[in-house]
C-alpha cells in the first residue's frame, strides 16, 4: 500500500509532461494527409481505368 501513492504521483507527472517529437521537423517533412490524398487519387484513377476499359477501350486512352 505504500507504493500506491508513489505510483499515482508518477502517473500524474508522466501525464503532465510536455510531449516532444522524436526528431525535429524539417522543411522537407510532408504531412501524412498529403500521402493519403495521393494514395486515394491513385486508387481512384486505377479503379476508373478498370471500369472504363472493361466496357470501352477508347476510354482508357483518356485516363492516362
From Swiss-Prot:
It is found in: Secreted. Residues 23-48 form a propeptide. Expressed by the venom duct. Residues 1-22 form the signal peptide. Keywords: Cleavage on pair of basic residues, Disulfide bond, Secreted, Signal, Toxin. Contains 2 disulfide bonds that can be either 'C1-C3, C2-C4' or 'C1-C4, C2-C3', since these disulfide connectivities have been observed for conotoxins with cysteine framework V (for examples, see AC P0DQQ7 and AC P81755). GO terms for cellular component: extracellular region. GO terms for molecular function: toxin activity. InterPro entries: T-conotoxin (IPR031565). Belongs to the conotoxin T superfamily. The cysteine framework is V (CC-CC). This is Conotoxin Pn-B01122. It comes from Conus pennaceus.
Amino acid at each position: 500500500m505504500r507504493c500506491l501513492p508513489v505510483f499515482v504521483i508518477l502517473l500524474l507527472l508522466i501525464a503532465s509532461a510536455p510531449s516532444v517529437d522524436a526528431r525535429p521537423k524539417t522543411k522537407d517533412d510532408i504531412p501524412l494527409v498529403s500521402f493519403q490524398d495521393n494514395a486515394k487519387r491513385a486508387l481512384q484513377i486505377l479503379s476508373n481505368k478498370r471500369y472504363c476499359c472493361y466496357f470501352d477501350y477508347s476510354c482508357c486512352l483518356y485516363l492516362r
